[in-house]
């Protein structure tokens, strides 16, 4: 019997994933990665109940120190530099999957699984296993996992790849799991009161009032601290002008936020930093790729360009979905081929 280590959060997705794996004949080992201070949170208790019901091993691993040093540090530094960071992508790549694979090796488990809505399939074009987006772009989570290396992908199982969320809840109800109607988590997991309150609590004196300005430097009003705003934001600015305005630039060094018309957000090219490709860059350079510059984006077509060791993505058409610090992920025929952070 082959073993699989599965990350379990206490939600319905990972719980049903564990059930499906057991039904498929695997020896399942449930692992909860706890980044919180409390040792017995509601999520941990829910996971214990599910594992007891399924008759599988459950282990809780404390990752608080790594989580603070890597994810929270990245999150705070990102907003402090005027970016809009993506902490879940960094957490998945640098902590969660790394630890799950280490635990799998400890148990001599052949596979690692999670409750993500994505799949791993073999690409005939690129002759390797790659992440592939699932049928519903609304639930597809391949975007979040683009930084996982090909050697990890070969050992990954995503049991939910062919299911809808409704079907998963129906399975959970059918097998009498208490989490069948548990709400999905919203926002970042470590900021239960919202990311703005988390920033205020942790950055404190670094958040100071500054000026809203137009592109010519004229003062339009005051903001509460540039860290509390994001590119493209329109609501919650606390300023009344004769026409709708959007945040087009955040100047962290001067504590100024530039406001402008929606049309000023449209660009046709972005530069990448911290890029990571599952397919050799040279194989992608002349291909038309679908780029998703944020998780909620359905994507825009264009091509990768390299100029003096810098990598850019040139869109076929301008769009207003790009924010500094967000990750842009590239797809070819549904397969995830790479991505990077928008500079």
From Swiss-Prot:
Location, primary (coarse class): cytoplasm
Interaction with tRNA, as annotated region: 139-141
Keyword Translocase: no
Active site per database record: 91 (nucleophile), 189 (cysteine persulfide intermediate)
Membership in a protein family: Belongs to the MnmA/TRMU family.
Annotated site location: Interaction with tRNA: 116, 326
Keyword Disulfide bond: yes
Principal EC category: transferase
Pfam families assigned to the protein according to its UniProt record, in alphabetical order: tRNA_Me_trans, tRNA_Me_trans_M
Keywords assigned by UniProt, alphabetized: ATP-binding, Cytoplasm, Disulfide bond, Nucleotide-binding, RNA-binding, Transferase, tRNA processing, tRNA-binding
Catalytic activity from the UniProt record: S-sulfanyl-L-cysteinyl-[protein] + uridine(34) in tRNA + AH2 + ATP = 2-thiouridine(34) in tRNA + L-cysteinyl-[protein] + A + AMP + diphosphate + H(+)
Superkingdom: Bacteria
Cellular-component GO terms for this entry: cytoplasm
Cell location: Cytoplasm
Binding site for ATP: 7-14, 33, 115
An example Gene Ontology molecular-function term: tRNA binding
GO biological process: tRNA wobble position uridine thiolation
Protein name per the record: tRNA-specific 2-thiouridylase MnmA 2
Gene that encodes it: mnmA2
């Amino acid at each position: 019997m082959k073993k699989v280590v599965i990350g379990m959060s206490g939600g319905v997705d990972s719980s049903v994933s564990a059930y499906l794996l057991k039904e498929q004949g695997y020896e399942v080992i449930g692992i909860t990665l706890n980044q919180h201070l409390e040792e017995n949170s509601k999520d941990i208790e829910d996971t214990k109940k599910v594992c007891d019901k399924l008759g599988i091993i459950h282990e809780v691993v404390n990752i608080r120190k790594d989580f603070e040093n890597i994810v929270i540090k990245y999150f705070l530094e990102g907003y402090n530099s005027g970016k809009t960071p993506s902490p879940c992508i960094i957490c998945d790549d640098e902590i969660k999957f790394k630890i799950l694979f280490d635990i799998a090796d400890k148990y001599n488990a052949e596979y690692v699984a999670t409750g993500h809505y994505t799949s791993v399939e073999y690409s005939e074009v690129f002759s390797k296993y790659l992440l592939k987006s699932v049928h519903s772009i609304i639930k597809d989570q391949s975007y979040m996992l683009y930084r996982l290396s090909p050697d990890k992908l070969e050992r990954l199982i995503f049991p939910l790849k062919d299911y809808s969320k409704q079907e998963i809840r129906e399975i959970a109800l059918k097998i009498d799991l208490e989490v069948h109607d548990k709400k999905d988590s919203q926002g970042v997991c470590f900021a239960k009161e919202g990311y703005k309150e988390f920033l205020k609590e942790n950055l404190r004196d670094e958040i100071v009032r500054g000026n809203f300005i137009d592109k010519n430097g004229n003062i339009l009003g005051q903001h509460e601290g540039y860290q509390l705003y994001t590119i493209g934001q329109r609501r919650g600015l606390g300023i009344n002008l004769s026409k709708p305005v959007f945040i087009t630039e955040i100047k962290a060094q001067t504590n100024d936020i530039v406001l402008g018309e929606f049309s000023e957000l449209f660009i046709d090219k972005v530069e990448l930093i911290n890029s990571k490709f599952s397919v050799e860059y040279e194989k992608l350079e002349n291909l038309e790729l679908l780029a998703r510059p944020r998780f909620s984006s359905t994507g825009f077509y264009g091509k990768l360009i390299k100029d003096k060791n810098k990598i850019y993505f040139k869109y076929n058409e301008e769009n207003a979905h790009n924010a500094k610090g967000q990750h842009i992920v590239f797809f070819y025929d549904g397969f995830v081929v790479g991505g990077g952070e928008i500079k």
